[in-house]
Amino acid sequence: MKTFMIILLVICSILIVGRVEANDNKRKYLLLDPCLRPNAPPGCHRQPYKPRTPVNVYSRGCTTINRCRRVQNP
């Protein structure tokens, strides 16, 4: 009886794992970004070698030449 239960448990686990792997393929096609799909349209190529740059470079708005922080004497 124990061997029958072990065999039944192994068969059920194989069936469950097979169904989970089958569902992974469907999720790839639910992507909203067309560039991330398997057959991307032209112009969506990524450049993995391109270094990242910050979106907004920090700038105080003044340089030492403009003397923006200078306090004027009355």
Curated annotation (Swiss-Prot):
GO biological process annotation, one example: cell-cell signaling
Signal peptide: 1-22
Domain of life assignment: Eukaryota
Alphabetical keyword list: Disulfide bond, Hormone, Secreted, Signal
Keyword Signal on entry: yes
Subcellular location: Secreted
Disulfide bond residue pairs: 35-44, 62-68
GO-annotated molecular function: hormone activity
GO cellular component: apoplast
InterPro entries given in the database record: RALF
Record family assignment: Belongs to the plant rapid alkalinization factor (RALF) family.
Function: Cell signaling peptide that may regulate plant stress, growth, and development. Mediates a rapid alkalinization of extracellular space by mediating a transient increase in the cytoplasmic Ca(2+) concentration leading to a calcium-dependent signaling events through a cell surface receptor and a concomitant activation of some intracellular mitogen-activated protein kinases.
Record-linked PANTHER family: PROTEIN RALF-LIKE 10-RELATED, PROTEIN RALF-LIKE 15-RELATED
Protein name listed in UniProt: Protein RALF-like 25
Organism: Arabidopsis thaliana (Mouse-ear cress)
